[in-house]
Amino acid sequence: MARAGQAVDPSPLGQPLEFHFARRSAPNRFLKAGMSERMCSWTEENPSARGIPSRELIETYRTWGRGNIGAIVTGNVMIDPNHIEAEGNPTIPPNALFSGERFDQFANLAAAARANGSLILAQISHPGRQTPSHRQPEPISASDVPLDTENMGNTFAVPRAATENEIKNIITGFAHAAEFLDRAGYDGVELHAAHGYLLNQFLSRATNLRTDKYGGTLTNRMRLILEIRAAITEKVRPGFIVGIKINSVEFQPNGIVPDEACELCCALEEHRFDFVELSGGKYKNLEEDDNAKHIISKRHEAFFLDVAQKVVSSLTKMKSYLTGGFRSTAGMVDGLQTVDGIGLARPFCQEPYLCHDILRGKIPGAIIPVMDQLNYQLTVAAACIQMRQIGNKVQPVDLSSQDAVDAITAAAEGWLKRKAIDRSEEAFKPPLLSGDAAPLSVEA
């Protein structure tokens, strides 16, 4: 198998990172970025029973916790079971109790992930217009701007603008989720304000056409996020970490541009966000977007590093992570000249102990997949399949092998067809590929 990079000194990546406002430290500069795992409970009939972490999901995070990742971010925790990104999302409903099966399973996940010293953070989110139309025919958003695309077999209904009362409920939902997670033993949360989800829909001029106090100027468009931050402060202990994920650039007219991202980051620092994770893009196949292809072809890794340099240049207290395209240790070390930490997502699905092996100088970087990395839906499906393999203690399928990629492609196509007609929990979970796969080591 081919790997990215050449041997370099990885020690800068092993340095602790202190979060100024929470007065907490991550043991190193790696961040496992949030992904949609789709391994929680699902039921058609009873929304209140949706989104309870499964044994498989807990085992996945136990494995990542063994890998010496500095900060581990769970994927896309929904705050409303009727507004979800995908079936199988972890969910904290607004009436969730601080006891019972849901609370216990979230607590078990946190304990498993942090058992070896990693920080565990939950990414909390509302999909807004990016909820499947067969799940929510009347989604809410900043405005009634439709999402004209298809993602993982899903289409999306035309949203309506959220009322001020609904906005208040959203703020309460985020704050309740943070309190729930704090009590369950999490070190912090990350607000998901990137990739086209609801908070991003309020930030972006492309989707926010409001004329009230939540629309127009950037000050108004970021108001919802800052009100959520204030509400969380009232519900959690002082040392609870609060971060946020934003797009540093968007591939659409009137989307977030670097100047706005820079202004936004200054406001986030002023309102005591501990870190910002910079990413880019929305629900759209990257192979269809010329601007995205240009950025990715220009930089073979660290796709948004040039933009990040401008965005974070004025920050003094809020820490910054950059996620998107890092594969070589050399590229990661170089990235630390611009940002404070390095976010990785899909590489940890292929190699859950990647961080451990890099920090010990055992490898020069991540395995290079032969799969087309611009094929958004296929790469997402592959990551979901690998995460479920990890949750079942099976070595993830090797995407540097064309035979394995062919198998993943066939499995992904079958998955999309199956979940279109079968509404059971098992049908919505990623396919479980085992075959001749070796058991996953319990030690990094």
UniProtKB/Swiss-Prot annotation:
GO terms for molecular function: flavin reductase (NADH) activity; FMN binding. GO terms for biological process: aflatoxin biosynthetic process. It holds the Pfam family Oxidored_FMN. Substrate binds at residues 192-195. Its EC number is 1.-.-.-. Signal peptide: none annotated. Disruption phenotype: Does not show any remarkable difference in production of B-group aflatoxin (AFB1 and AFB2) compared to the wild-type but leads to significant decrease in production of G-group aflatoxins (AFG1 and AFG2). Leads to the accumulation of a yellow AFG1 precursor called NADA. It comes from the Eukaryota. GO terms for cellular component: cytosol. Keywords: Cytoplasm, FAD, Flavoprotein, FMN, NAD, Oxidoreductase. It is an enzyme of class 1 (oxidoreductase). Residues 127-149 are annotated as: Disordered. Induction: Expression is regulated by the aflatoxin cluster-specific transcription factor aflR. FMN binds at residues 37-40, 123, 345-346. It is found in: Cytoplasm, Cytosol. The keyword Nucleotide-binding does not apply. Belongs to the NADH:flavin oxidoreductase/NADH oxidase family. NADH-dependent flavin oxidoreductase; part of the gene cluster that mediates the biosynthesis of aflatoxins, a group of polyketide-derived furanocoumarins, and part of the most toxic and carcinogenic compounds among the known mycotoxins. The four major aflatoxins produced by A.parasiticus are aflatoxin B1 (AFB1), aflatoxin B2 (AFB2), aflatoxin G1 (AFG1) and aflatoxin G2 (AFG2). Within the aflatoxin pathway, the NADH-dependent flavin oxidoreductase nadA is specifically required for the last steps in which OMST is converted specifically to aflatoxin G1. This is NADH-dependent flavin oxidoreductase nadA. The lineage of its organism: Eukaryota, Fungi, Dikarya, Ascomycota, Pezizomycotina. The gene is nadA.
